[in-house]
């Protein structure tokens, strides 16, 4: 799916969008935040609920359930198409790309309580070393004060993982993970290994766009509902796209 990033979408809901461009960390990496993004949250929640229950993930560090969205999922796929079209001018403006292609899309819900996390799930992570890969995160159901935080690895000063520094990051991260307490839970703010450099609050119908190489983690309070019900748990739409 190719998307022209310079063409404004012909959507009536575009008028309600409230975009903000953040620059975070020492690298001043762009992060896009768009409030009131879709204007049709109840309809999207109904689409996600219709695809439940979501399957458990295998060989994936995401702390919960994820339902991939494909062409056969007509309503969900149409929503993803519209999301990409509406986000295109913001991606183009913030990251200076002419167009992009969708890699994958899914509905995701956090269901793993802090006590059951694996060591990698307790630390910030990155999605890709590809500088042209971007993550789009659409907050849908927000059961408690949560969000997304961005980090700098203290020992290496890495904020964005690239092919040039991924080996250094992984070596340090493995050593540090071995030192984490088994009951440390989800990272919250800064700790001895990672410094939080920015955070974005999870607000229903807020869209977050950032480079896949940025170190990040969900802000997941221990008191949050870890329900697998899309209307009760922390539900997001997660997209990965690549600039062409």
Predicted regions and their residues:
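Fe(II)/2-oxoglutarate oxygenase catalytic core
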Residues: 1-209, 213-244
């Amino acid at each position: 799916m190719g998307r022209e990033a310079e063409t404004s979408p012909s959507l009536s809901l575009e008028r309600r969008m409230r975009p903000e461009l953040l620059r975070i960390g020492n690298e001043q990496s762009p992060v896009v935040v768009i409030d009131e993004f879709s204007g049709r949250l109840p309809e999207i929640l109904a689409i996600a609920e219709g695809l439940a229950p979501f399957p458990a993930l295998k060989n994936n560090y995401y702390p919960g359930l994820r339902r991939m969205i494909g062409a056969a999922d007509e309503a969900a796929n149409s929503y993803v198409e519209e999301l990409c079209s509406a986000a295109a001018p913001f991606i183009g403006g913030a990251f200076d790309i002419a167009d992009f292609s969708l890699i994958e899309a899914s509905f995701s819900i956090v269901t793993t309580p802090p006590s059951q996390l694996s060591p990698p799930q307790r630390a910030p992570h990155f999605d890709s070393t590809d500088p042209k890969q971007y993550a789009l995160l659409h907050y849908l159901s927000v059961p408690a004060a949560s969000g997304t935080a961005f980090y700098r690895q203290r020992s290496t000063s890495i904020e964005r993982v690239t092919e040039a520094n991924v080996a250094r990051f992984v070596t340090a991260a493995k050593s540090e993970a071995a030192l984490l307490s088994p009951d440390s839970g989800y990272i919250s703010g800064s700790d001895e290994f990672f410094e939080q450099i920015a955070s974005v609050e999870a607000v229903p119908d807020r869209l977050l766009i950032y480079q896949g190489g940025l170190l990040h983690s969900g802000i997941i309070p221990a008191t949050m509902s870890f329900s697998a019900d899309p209307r009760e748990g922390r539900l997001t739409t997660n997209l990965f796209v690549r600039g062409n």
